[in-house]
Amino acid sequence: MDATIGVTVGDSLDRLEATIDGFDFVEFAIGEGAEPDEVDDERLASILAEAGADLCVHLPFKQDVATHVPEINAGIRDYLGRLLEWAGGVGAEKAVLHGTARNPHDTDLRPIFADQLAAVDAAAADAGVELVVENVGHQARGFPLSVLGDLARETGTAVCFDVGHAYMEDGDDGVDRFCSGYGDLVSHLHVHDVRSRGDTHLPIGAGEVDYGVVSEHFGGFDGTVAVEVFTDDVDMLRDSARRAGTALDAER
């Protein structure tokens, strides 16, 4: 079965409408700057129906999942649960969550993160949405690749593997090691290109990532793949989708 290839659109319905054509789904950002009660649900449904596309969501980018303060952790669970309830109500299939903690290098926080992740995963399941936890180990509050993989396996949580993030953290070798050890957990991919000097979310082919490594591990992948390239140039987005499809043996 071919992978399902979509595009990330941030929190803008205008961008969603302008870029959706030709993609199987969109990944729409919610929370923080785009609270669910501010989203025009009817317009969202109409755009998706007209394009024949599905919906995934991205939970707040800067929201830590775990701290040492129980009251804050409870608030995080409640907040994410509310967003997931909305996501399920509008038919989202998956919800992406950054794998972050107040201090990801504090080993005492790891079991707390595991408990938080399991609770959010359960809330997603109750809403009819699959939670996927994303690697952001190149960022200050992101867990390192292997730690996130271990925590995802411990909690039975699916993974959103961001190829560019993994490269920024540990190069092509890091991509290879994570896929070798945890590839069976991956149901959602973020694809884009990067350069080690700090450029990220570039069109595939414009950076340094060896997508041959991705092909070795995910050839024939039948999950969801989101093109996360920061441009509104539709031709460029479609070219990255084509390149991703080639790497994954998915026809476009």
Residue map of PLM features:
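Histidine-acidic metal/acid-base catalytic patches
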Residues: 1-2, 64, 118, 144, ...
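Acidic (Asp/Glu)-rich catalytic clusters
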Residues: 15-22, 37-57, 81-91, 115-126, ...
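Conserved, mostly hydrophobic/aromatic
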Residues: 26, 58, 76, 87, ...
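Acidic-and-aromatic substrate-binding clefts and catalytic sites of carbohydrate-active enzymes
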Residues: 8-16, 29-43, 63-71, 102-107, ...
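N-terminal pre-domain/capping segments
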Residues: 1-82, 158
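Active-site acidic/histidine proton-transfer and metal-coordination neighborhood
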Residues: 66-159, 251
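Short loop/turn segments at strand-loop or loop-helix junctions that form parts
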Residues: 58-62, 97-101, 192-193
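Short, structured patches in soluble enzyme cores that scaffold and shape functional sites
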Residues: 99, 133-135, 163, 193, ...
